[in-house]
Amino acid sequence: MATTEANTMAQANSQTTIEPVRHLANFPPSIWGDQFLSFSLDNSQLEAYSKAMEQPKENVRRMILNPAIDTNEKLGLIYCVYRLGLTYNFSKDIDGQLDELFKQLNLQSYNEADLYTISIHFQVFRHFGYRFSCDVFNKFKDSSSGKFKEDMTRDVRGMISLYESAQLRIRGESILDEAGAFAESKLKTIEKTLDGTLAQQVKHVLERPFNRGHQMVEARKYLFLFEEEISRYDSLLMLAKVHFNYLQLLQKEELRSVSKWWKDLDLPAKTLYVRDRVPELYVWILAFFLEPYYSEVRIITTKIVLLVLVLDDTYDAYATIEESRLLTHAINRWEVSAMLQLPEYMKPLYEILLNEYDGFYKHGRTNVIETSKKAFQDLARSYHQESEWRHAKEVPSFEEYMKIGTTTSAHNVLSKTALIGMGNIVTREALAWYESYPKIVQLSELIGRLEDDVVSVEFERERAPTATSVDAYMKTYGVSENVAVKILKKLVENGWKDLNEACLKPTEVSLDLLAPIIGLTNMTDVAYRHNDGLTFPEKTLKEYITLLFCVPVPM
């Protein structure tokens, strides 16, 4: 009897499947559902917008090229053009004008200029890569105290522009460090005394300086907050409104296309543990380029960033360490046969990944595709290393962590993936530059990793024993969390300074080739400055998606 009972229990135990422990994150669901799937592009409306832009565009071009317009007026016009996201329509015209104006520049002529004028000139030249000297701001400092003059605060418009100028600083420009701190402090005080549009302008610049913003969202907000200033140029105001609505239609069609692809894959249903973030990640990639002719770049890169997110959540929020090793091995092999060794839930992701990259070969840029693929494999290996640390409950040294953590920012794979659809601009030399792991990519990764870690450290600790850069820094240097966070934020600020310098002429490659790197970095700041905007999109990205795709600009 006892033997029979023992045999029965043994048989039952052998048939029992022990469910592995998984560090589920319980991510919030998509707040959009299938909302963007139902969009239908109205080609007649698109054509109407295109036609409506023709004359205003020509009028603005004539103003940019008009030799009778003085320097202040011309630079003010160019400032409005790029703040409104219109630069690509006039790139050659603007470059030609700025080259001439910069050659003629005489810093002595700024001795009598006001704060607003000097700040606008500084921003325009720095934005387009010219090494405009920050010494022009010395005149606003008190000669005895060495501090900025208090009476500057009466010029609110000038203070806003001074704060924007400070965001373009590079290392060694201590006067701009001081200017940024001074302007921020005074604007926070001034904001409490203001109302109406001026109060909104101050609030916005403190929340989101242009140099760290999403260019399409910033265009929309600039159009609303500064319409009175723009209205001096009737044609520019009309062009900006029509242009935004024109791009909105095109971008909604791109978002519909990607949403349908995602829906057809049915990955969220097959991998219930992942974040479903199609509109949010499309907005992320939209930060690269606004140009209509880069539509394919946006679609390709959005598809890959969605697969990156699934991969991230698989390693981070679901896979056991054994499954993680199998997935990494399969991605390293990059063969259909490798799928056989994977758990069932991983097979759809792996199959889709291989199919998507196979589809890219129709572009005929094998070397570019291989560069993206290698970066994806490197990303998988780095995700796996983080899994090994988590499994061992190990906190690596700060140096060890950053070698891996910068890669898992995914900036390298996404910037290289963008090259697939960029055409002949990606020369052999340009690709070699990207493959050399240039400093600007390293800076982008550093900023991305540290900003993400600083805002998500508590969430990661609550969910699983996951080491972040904060933990690694605390362990390596024996400091408190507050001290570690303060130091990491300083590293981020220095990263921005170096990034600004990398965009000054002469650049190693064209600005178009730098755009994906800059766009990724800006979106990191947008999403992670105050919270984890990708995991909890209702806090930041919901507003962006609403502004971009749900409401056209009133005409």
Swiss-Prot record:
Expression sites (tissue/organ): Mainly expressed in sunflower trichomes.
One of the protein's GO biological processes: diterpenoid biosynthetic process
UniProt: Mg(2+) 1 binding residues: 312, 316
Binding locations of Mg(2+) 2: 312, 316
KW Metal-binding (keyword) present: yes
Domain of life: Eukaryota
Cofactor annotation: Mg(2+)
Xref: Pfam families: Terpene_synth, Terpene_synth_C
Keywords associated with the record: Lyase, Magnesium, Metal-binding
Role description: Involved in the biosynthesis of germacrene-derived sesquiterpene lactones. Catalyzes the cyclization of farnesyl diphosphate to alpha-copaene, delta-cadinene, alpha-muurolene, beta-caryophyllene and alpha-humulene.
UniProt domain comment: The Asp-Asp-Xaa-Xaa-Asp/Glu (DDXXD/E) motif is important for the catalytic activity, presumably through binding to Mg(2+).
Protein name: Alpha-copaene synthase
Native source species: Helianthus annuus
